[in-house]
UniProtKB/Swiss-Prot annotation:
Taxonomic lineage from the root: Eukaryota, Metazoa, Ecdysozoa, Nematoda, Chromadorea
SMART domains in alphabetical order: Tim44
Organism of origin: Caenorhabditis elegans
Subunit and interaction comment: Probable component of the PAM complex at least composed of a mitochondrial HSP70 protein, GrpE, tin-44, tim-16 and tim-14/dnj-21. The complex interacts with the tim-23 component of the TIM23 complex.
PANTHER family: MITOCHONDRIAL IMPORT INNER MEMBRANE TRANSLOCASE SUBUNIT TIM44 (PTHR10721:SF1)
Family statement: Belongs to the Tim44 family.
Protein known as: Probable mitochondrial import inner membrane translocase subunit tin-44
Amino acid sequence: MLSRICGNGIRLTRTRLQFQPSIVTFRDYSNPAPKRGFLNNLIDNVRDEMQKNKELQEHQQQLKARMQELNESDALKDARKKFEIVEKETLKSSEVVKQKIEELSDHMKKMVHEIQKTEAGKKMTEAGAEALKQARKAAEHVEKVAEKVGDTEVYKHVSTSMKTVKDEIDNIADVRMYSRPEALTKRTDGFDLEKERVVEANDSATDVTLHKDSKWYSGWKNFSESNTYYHKLLDWKIKYDESDNMAVRMMRGVTEKIGSVFSGQNEVSEVLTEIHKIDANFDKQEWLRFCETKIIPNILEAFIRFDLEVLQSWCHERAYTQLSTVVKEYQKMHFSTKDSRIIDINKVEMATGKMMEQGPVLIISFQVYMINVTKNADGKVVEGDPDNPKRINHIWVLCRDVEEYNPALAWKLLEVHMQETPLAL
């Protein structure tokens, strides 16, 4: 209710009316849909499945007809003939591959058995057997590869067979096991692979002065005695390589890269450049492989067998004096090292180099695993242990004879350093 007073004193009153709408509810009453019975649902399901099966059969018949058309086409017939020809040729090739791998496996087994048949090999304890474990594993691996080649898809599917054979061959391509040479080779005898590559002097590219062998060591001696890096190399290189610590092994890859900044890599580059002036086809990795398979085995085996003639062929006067003195002293006392056996040669690396007045000098380091035994005339062990292999770290100084243009004959041992350490198992 609202009110107000007018000017004449009369009060006017107005009342506001409010209406409340009423809520009307409608309810729909209808009959529920009748429920389908079990039998009706079953009939509908059977009808749907029959319809789907009919469509499936139609699609299957269409696919069969299409495959029949493709199978009878001339293009597919020609492709099938070519496939059969390739498959036959691949089977022939796989047989050859399998045969070659089996031959390699037999060769490696014979090498291991040769060591085991020796007197030192028969007396080997668990420590000695462990030293040959890697050799046996390599032989067993090759044998398994041969079996895998026979069982792979070579005999079933050409596309997969060719890849399988390639992968298996790649896996064993880098297997290098030391094989003891039956007959030693002098440096002057040369090697077949290198005799074909005779290099002639390049007078316009090099000004290297030619000198006699007697001047070789005098120049090297002056350098080695005054060079502190060389002395440090002899010390830390041996200690670093002989470490079996996990952290040290992980760091080797890093230090090899960083070391090139602080070590004599610049001098090595200079030496390699000068070598290329004499031998344009010189390759560092090929040369290290030549050292591993030719130079090192012949010198070490000649030292073990007391073959002074072969030693003298490979060594300059200084290195020959070092090695021959030991041999001659042993011969005077009727000592023998014939039961010593080299098991493996590895980690052949180029440590540094130096360009001397007489020519290029390269220093290599490597490790030798061997049974190192010295016996007297009565067959008793006077030095070494036939039951425990040793790891011997080597640092060799090799010089190139610039008067010799045949690379197979040009390299001689100038100086040798050895340090024997027990094999850590």
